[in-house]
A protein has these predicted regions:
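Glycine-rich beta-strand-to-loop/alpha-helix junction loops that act as flexible
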Residues: 161-164, 197-204, 240-243
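Active-site-proximal beta-alpha core segment in soluble small-molecule metabolic enzymes
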Residues: 8-196, 222, 226
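An N-cap/entry alpha-helix motif that binds or orients negatively charged groups
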Residues: 1-6
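Conserved active-site and cofactor/substrate-binding residues in soluble primary-metabolism enzymes
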Residues: 20, 104, 138, 170, ...
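Charged (often Lys/Glu-rich) extended helix/loop segments that serve as interaction or gating elements
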Residues: 235-404
Length: 404
């Protein structure tokens, strides 16, 4: 992205897309968007520098904000504002940035900041796209107009994200034009200079058979032209999650049974919809990127491939629900128990968005791959039954066993 967009465009990784990439993103990206206490805890354990964190989220818990503000308050000298609050003097970590999605969040940030001796908090005011997130234009204008009511906050920028999987470049251009108009209005009506814009473009990732491939370089070059056309010349940060993470992940599942019911071939795999999640997939009607890996028959797994030459299979998971269908009518000639299916382009969200606790099935193991280091196990397969047991003592014993 940097090669096409230029080094002046900052890249923020939305870690909700895949938290297992946090350490790598901390090294490669300019920052990370963090939306919960749990995500913040992952960042701190990974050693993510505080100045790389943008604390976002529609629900900011008071205890969590106090924790982050406290961490930020001891990271540098007090009293910086203006350009210094945005960039920080050389060698001094600046405070984390915070998004504000409501007046109550602003009050919370102001209250927490007033109790520390740290820097004024960098705040990005989130503009709504017509839903529960962010605030409308008039509210944002009113906040900036009354900025003296927030002496411990510095409104450095705007944040805007309207959704994912945008196929039309024209929609992104229109959003940038609207943002540019609002920034110009703030400048002209309030004589206030917004210094940074955090924008989530929601670039499209083709997941399914029949979708047109995306020329990513051309798409990014077109996006750069749209940015250059803006009157706004401050700092621009792009929030990207799916676009970065989706191509980086694959899910491997094994065929454990095959059968034929009323002329339809079914294969059962050891995963299911609790592990596999593609945005836009509905009732297994679309075929995602799948590879078929024939495998020698596993011991103790007799081949019960149904008779007949039909190679079209409906792939179902291990959950006891008719909704656990991954793909319908998938061509798999010669399929047998023990074979494996690899679902590609699944690095975003599937690792966390699955209905993992349903039926108390195990969580899948997670491995990372690097060219030099090869495969590395970062999480083994984990039981979910302790979460569903109903016994507090049993759950606590399991936690102690995992974390002695």
């Amino acid at each position: 992205m940097k090669e096409v967009l230029g080094q002046d465009i900052k890249i923020l990784y939305a870690m909700k897309a895949n938290p297992f990439f946090t350490r790598t993103a901390a090294q490669e990206a300019d920052g990370l968007e963090v939306c919960s206490p749990g995500e913040y805890a992952i960042c701190r354990r990974a050693g993510v520098p505080l100045e790389k964190i943008v604390l976002s989220g529609v629900n900011k818990e008071a205890s969590h904000v106090r924790e982050v503000v406290g961490d930020a308050g001891i990271s540098g000298p007090a009293g910086r504002s203006g350009a210094d609050a945005l960039s920080g003097p050389a060698g001094t970590p600046g405070p984390a940035a915070y998004t504000a999605e409501s007046l109550s969040q602003l009050d919370l940030l102001e209250s927490c900041a007033a109790k520390t001796q740290g820097n004024p908090l960098r705040v990005l005011l989130r503009l709504t796209s017509g839903n529960q997130f962010g605030m409308d234009e008039e509210t944002i204008l009113s906040i900036i107009k009354k900025r003296s009511s927030y002496p411990h906050l510095h409104f450095t920028g705007l944040q805007y994200y309207s959704g994912t999987q945008k196929k039309q470049a024209g929609k992104i251009r229109k959003e940038l034009e609207q943002l540019d108009a609002l920034l110009e209005r703030i400048r002209n009506e309030l004589q206030y200079e917004i210094r940074e814009l955090e924008y989530g473009p929601g670039f499209h990732i083709p997941y399914f058979e029949g979708e047109s491939p995306v020329d990513e370089d051309a798409m990014l070059a077109d996006f750069r032209e749209a940015l250059d056309a803006m009157a706004f010349k401050g700092r621009i940060s792009l929030e990207a999650g799916r676009f970065l993470a989706a191509p980086c992940g694959s899910y491997v599942t094994r065929v454990v049974d095959t059968k034929q019911n009323q002329g339809q071939n079914y294969c059962i795999v050891d995963g299911g919809i609790n592990h596999v999640n593609y945005y836009g997939q509905a009732m297994a009607m679309k075929i995602p990127a799948i590879r078929f890996l024939p495998h020698p028959l596993s011991p103790g797994m007799p081949d019960v491939q149904p008779p007949g030459g039909d190679s079209q299979w409906t792939v179902c998971g291990s959950l006891c629900t008719s909704g656990d269908m991954l793909v319908k009518n998938l061509p798999l000639p010669g399929l047998k128990t023990g074979d494996m299916l690899v679902f590609d382009r699944i690095g975003a969200y599937a690792v966390t968005e699955g209905i993992y606790l349903f039926l108390s099935r195990r969580l899948p193991a997670v491995l990372t791959y690097e060219k030099d280091a090869g495969l590395k196990l970062v999480r083994g397969a984990l039981p979910t039954s302790p979460f569903n047991d109903g016994s507090i003592q049993y759950f606590e014993d399991c936690i102690k066993k995992e974390n002695p």
